[in-house]
């Protein structure tokens, strides 16, 4: 049967299984779902699947039985022709995205806090609580070593239960922006407090700056566990 574009969009939203679908109908189904804002993945192995594979957001061709035309039109080639591999790939991709977001949420307030410490000291005309060499050491050694832990973080238990993330959604939600600002402000206040206390306690400038470095490192470690 021939359907209009509006009818095809309604059918695509309400029907789960289609059988004996022609190449033209496959292409129409993909376009109908995309019009409704869906991210469409299409699997295929034959020449007749090429248009729909090309149109879909993620075209997946079979590696063993797939034709060269289908492989050229696809974005991904499924080497073992096992559909369970697609689920495993989605799961791994969500895990990578989660860990990347955790790292961003962790490293942004740390870097912003260090910048606020330096800027506040410059504008206030006081001694710099942490030297440029110490900042370099924190960023190159401490941050890299601690940040590597997020790369090997295990996936969340509900990772495949969650609904798909909207492509238009920001990487860092607005709620986390306020959290980043709060942690940065706490870090800046803690650094200045310990720096001032060390100097008033009769410690040298080197000891006071070392104290600030330790404060930054301990805040990084504590906040890292919080981000997990």
Walk through the language-model features, giving the residues of each:
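Membrane-embedded transport module
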Residues: 1-42, 56, 61-228
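Basic, alpha-helical nucleic-acid-binding regions used in initiation and control of genome expression
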Residues: 53
């Amino acid at each position: 049967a021939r359907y209009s574009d509006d009818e095809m969009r309604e059918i695509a939203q309400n029907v789960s299984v289609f059988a004996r679908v022609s190449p033209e109908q496959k292409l129409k189904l993909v376009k109908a779902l995309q019009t409704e804002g869906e991210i469409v993945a299409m699997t295929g192995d034959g020449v007749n699947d090429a248009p729909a594979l090309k149109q879909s957001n993620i075209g997946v061709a079979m590696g063993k039985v797939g034709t060269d035309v289908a492989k050229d039109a696809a974005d991904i080639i499924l080497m073992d022709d096992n559909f369970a591999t697609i689920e495993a790939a989605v799961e791994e991709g969500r895990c990578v995205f989660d860990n990347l977001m955790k790292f961003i949420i962790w490293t942004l307030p740390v870097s912003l806090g260090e910048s606020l410490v330096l800027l506040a000291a410059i504008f206030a005309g006081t001694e710099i609580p942490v030297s440029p060499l110490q900042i370099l050491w924190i960023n190159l050694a401490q941050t890299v070593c601690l940040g590597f832990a997020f790369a090997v973080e295990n996936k969340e238990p509900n990772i495949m239960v969650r609904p798909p993330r909207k492509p238009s959604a920001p990487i860092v939600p607005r709620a986390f922006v306020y959290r980043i600002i709060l942690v940065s402000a706490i870090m800046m206040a803690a650094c200045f407090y310990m720096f001032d206390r060390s100097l008033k306690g009769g410690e040298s400038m080197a000891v006071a700056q070392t104290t600030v470095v330790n404060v930054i490192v301990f805040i990084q470690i504590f906040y890292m566990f919080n981000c997990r």
